[in-house]
Design a protein with these regions (language model features):
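Glycine/threonine-rich phosphate-binding loop and adjacent beta-strand/alpha-helix elements that clamp
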Residues: 92, 102, 114-347
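Active-site-proximal cap/loop segments of hydrolase catalytic domains
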Residues: 1-121
Length: 347
């Protein structure tokens, strides 16, 4: 079915649907619809989940208000999807500590700022982040930042075929190696868990990582626990034989049993030849246990969480499925192409 069927044009010519298709990229149209908060100054309790579709907006608002507000700002992020706020999301149970604390916290907040009752909330540190893996809360005075460490992609050139071919190292390899994989729009890499699919959360994804249209880069087993908190960025030196292509980046914990559970991901559509491709992943707070490893998985699709890129460069809503192209992508690492992950490491 076409994105602009004649019947919608005839029966709903003034529908916002047409505006959405016309403004399929960030523009002034969307800026005008965004809430104007520059004159807002109120105490706020910001609530989010690591697998919440809207987490980026929650964190952005908290950072904005915390930087200029004269009123207290508090942020709490648990191992949750958008709703409900419970101890289990996806395939994992995060324990009793993850059980919903929000209702009680809201009452304390309202009692303090609406009734003037001293509930002790102003004596607490303003940021509460649930550390997955350790399954307990961590407190911060400000959003973790400036704590990034680079881990570089390295490969034998067979990262699409062998799970031991792509690795993650603390130093960039001297020589450049290319990994090549092929995106088929008729059998796209499926979405599984994360923050953009339903059901959300951490899922066992080793079967997906075995596909030949997925590149995997895995660290060595850790000799000590690794603690992450904050924003994660992936920079990939990637080219393709199409006008446009997508990249999906997923970070997972690889347990010593061989099972693989995702904990954050990001997605980007590339319409230019700019290198490296920068992918901002969902923020996270995660402990990867000693003896386990962590992995980056790269693919050119994550369907149906994101629509398949036809590779034609046609505007969203105008591309036809029949015109979708098979796309060959090349990821380069090492030498002059330092593909890397910027991890937010905390003590």
């Amino acid at each position: 079915m076409p994105a602009r069927p004649e019947i919608i044009k005839n029966l709903a010519p003034d529908s916002y649907y047409h505006d959405w298709l016309d403004n399929y990229r960030p523009s002034e149209y969307w800026e005008k619809l965004s809430p104007n908060i520059k004159d807002l100054d109120l105490p706020m309790l910001h609530v989010g989940g690591w697998f919440d579709t809207y987490l980026r907006g929650t964190i952005h608002l908290y950072k904005e208000m915390a930087s200029r507000s004269s009123c207290p700002q508090h942020l709490i992020i648990g191992p949750w999807a958008h709703l409900p706020w419970g101890r289990k999301v996806g395939a994992l149970d995060y324990g009793f500590a993850a059980s919903n604390p929000v209702d009680e916290l809201q009452i304390r907040y309202f009692d303090r700022f609406l009734k003037g009752v001293d509930t002790g909330i102003l004596d607490e540190r303003p940021i509460s982040l649930f550390e997955m893996g350790r399954n307990d809360w961590r407190k911060f005075d400000k959003w973790p930042n400036n704590n990034h460490k680079s881990y570089f992609l390295a490969s034998t050139g067979l990262a699409a075929m062998r799970e031991d071919a792509g690795i993650l190292t603390e130093s960039c390899a001297d020589a450049c190696t290319d990994d090549i994989f092929v995106h088929d729009p008729w059998r796209p890499v499926p979405s599984l868990g994360g923050h953009a699919a339903f059901p959300a959360g951490a899922m066992e994804r080793s079967t997906i990582d075995c596909r030949t249209d997925v590149l995997t880069y895995t660290s060595a087993p850790l000799t000590a626990d690794l603690h992450l908190a904050g924003d994660i960025i992936v920079e990939v030196c990637c080219t393709a034989d199409a006008q446009s292509f997508d990249l999906c980046a997923i970070l997972s914990e690889v347990k010593d049993s061989g099972s693989v559970y995702n904990f954050t991901q990001g997605y980007v559509r590339v319409n230019s030849g700019e290198i490296p491709v920068r992918i901002v992943l969902q923020s996270t707070c995660m402990q990867i246990a000693k003896g386990n490893a962590w992995r980056l998985s790269l693919s050119a699709a994550c369907f149906p969480a994101y629509e398949v890129n036809p590779g034609t460069g046609a505007p969203d809503g105008e591309a036809r499925a029949i015109d979708a192209k098979i796309i060959t992508l090349t990821v380069s690492c090492g030498g002059n192409f330092p593909s890397q992950i910027l991890l937010p490491i905390v003590d």
